[in-house]
Amino acid sequence: MSLNMFWFLPTHGDGHYLGTEEGSRPVDHGYLQQIAQAADRLGYTGVLIPTGRSCEDAWLVAASMIPVTQRLKFLVALRPSVTSPTVAARQAATLDRLSNGRALFNLVTGSDPQELAGDGVFLDHSERYEASAEFTQVWRRLLLGETVNFNGKHIHVRGAKLLFPPIQQPYPPLYFGGSSDVAQELAAEQVDLYLTWGEPPELVKEKIEQVRAKAAAHGRKIRFGIRLHVIVRETNDEAWQAAERLISHLDDETIAKAQAAFARTDSVGQQRMAALHNGKRDNLEISPNLWAGVGLVRGGAGTALVGDGPTVAARINEYAALGIDSFVLSGYPHLEEAYRVGELLFPHLDVAIPEIPQPQPLNPQGEAVANDFIPRNVAQS
């Protein structure tokens, strides 16, 4: 099975070390463009662009990278409760059209009550998933070309429609990650690819089996992906030394503050990440070559595969054997590590190299009539 390898655009900052200004660098448009172009040339399938108040806007960043890349896909967040599904469907179709079919979408429900309140969202965990399920139903139906009337608990639309369809049919693939039962049910019923954070293989296997069974109950099959950091070097010793350097400027106070912030979230996945290290610096190798040091101060994906190319490739293939076909990777700093992964890891894997999409045929189109429909040719009387 060929593997889809993704990279990451660090719109919330980048550098050589975690938890310090030491070794940091400016993350401006030019730098993000360098990373995107490196990923494009090295054969990555796409890039994940993060979302939230600590990040630049993912949609604008993705749109700005379209002209400077050829085949790279952009995995961009959909935010139920923050954005209406009709607006999100128009945005998604437009991004897909402008990129010639290079748009992918990642459903993000949110987990930090403090940040959500700042965005005007005051739903609890279960209510957010109710709203996300309704959002996704409307979003998918619009992209399928339906005129949608929907009267849900959280979302109400009447006569909603999309005039400009996406390039990818029936719609651009929808990714989603969540560890709670209600999250897995949403994934099983509505999304195309279920993402998990980088837990030890036995825990990942358990989640995959749960989601696969839930999807089968809906008569569906679903793909799987995993989000991991990677520290790959020419030797295993060099890789572990690089891992230790990454957290060499962290002090206990910074770790404690970060863990306190993570504790206020209601994300089951974040709780599972925190349990891998319990906020302590010792025993961070939680599974062979799987290191939890990143999660001491970074929310979300908090583990890294560490080793030389053949070793990391062997660990990736262990996850692939569980049914995972997509790997969303990152490393610090992201420009240099994109090259290291491409040069030291890719030769030891069966990597799916994306093709440059072919230009779409030009279809003449008149101006929309009455903000309601696109004029079509009619017989002359």
UniProtKB/Swiss-Prot annotation:
Subunit relationships: Homotetramer.
Function recorded in the entry: Catalyzes the desulfonation of aliphatic sulfonates.
SUPFAM superfamilies (alphabetical): Bacterial luciferase-like
Any one Gene Ontology molecular-function term assigned to this protein's record: alkanesulfonate monooxygenase activity
GO biological process, one term: alkanesulfonate catabolic process
Keyword field: Flavoprotein, FMN, Monooxygenase, Oxidoreductase
Family according to the record: Belongs to the SsuD family.
EC numbers for this chain: 1.14.14.5
NCBIfam families in the record: alk_sulf_monoox, PRK00719.1
Catalytic activity line of the entry: an alkanesulfonate + FMNH2 + O2 = an aldehyde + FMN + sulfite + H2O + 2 H(+)
Organism: Escherichia coli O6:K15:H31 (strain 536 / UPEC)
InterPro entries (alphabetical): Alkanesulphonate_mOase_FMN-dep (IPR019911), Luciferase-like_dom (IPR011251), Luciferase-like_sf (IPR036661), SsuD_RutA_monooxygenase (IPR050172)
UniProt name for this protein: Alkanesulfonate monooxygenase
